[in-house]
């Protein structure tokens, strides 16, 4: 039942947040220690940032939002400091690649939360396997001092 609820929340989030035009601004950055949310696909060393990352304490989720579009959603069992295995049953990772209509869902990987203090969340993620978009094989990145709402 909990998995169904998380899945429904994910679908609702994607539906509500993905209804605006795409921006041509790529916000590329190669400094992973910058506050915010950075990600790259397929092992690229060029990191891309998003404009409005945040974590939801209520849903135990991390959102990477760019110009009102959800790019990455991570649903976990907790936002406590620790390591979480992405397995598509208890911990879920979704990547909505800009410029496409597809969704890549992670089936293996790890999300590590290294700090949760003062309503800010910091950590890393490395999703090594998934499906849904043929040219995406992996997604990795970091989030540093993103606000917890």
Regions found by a protein language model. Give the residues of each.
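Sec-dependent bacterial lipoprotein signal peptides
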Residues: 1-19
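Bacterial Sec-dependent N-terminal signal peptides
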Residues: 14-42
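Surface-exposed helix/loop patches within compact recognition domains
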Residues: 37-39, 45-118, 131
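A short hydrophobic beta-strand element
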Residues: 119-127
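Edge beta-strand at a domain terminus
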Residues: 127-149
């Amino acid at each position: 039942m909990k998995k169904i609820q998380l899945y429904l929340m994910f679908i609702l989030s994607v539906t509500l947040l993905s209804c605006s035009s795409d921006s041509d601004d790529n916000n590329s950055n190669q400094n992973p220690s910058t506050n915010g949310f950075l990600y790259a696909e397929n092992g690229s060393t060029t990191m891309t940032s998003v404009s409005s990352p945040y974590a939801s304490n209520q849903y135990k989720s991390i959102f990477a939002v760019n110009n009102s579009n959800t790019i990455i959603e991570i649903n976990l069992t907790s936002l406590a400091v620790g390591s979480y295995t992405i397995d598509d049953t208890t911990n879920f990772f979704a990547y909505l690649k800009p410029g496409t209509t597809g969704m890549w869902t992670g089936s293996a990987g790890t999300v590590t939360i290294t700090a949760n203090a003062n309503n800010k969340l910091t950590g890393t993620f490395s999703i090594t396997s998934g499906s849904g978009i043929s040219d995406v094989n992996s997604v990795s990145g970091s989030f540093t001092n993103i606000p917890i709402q």
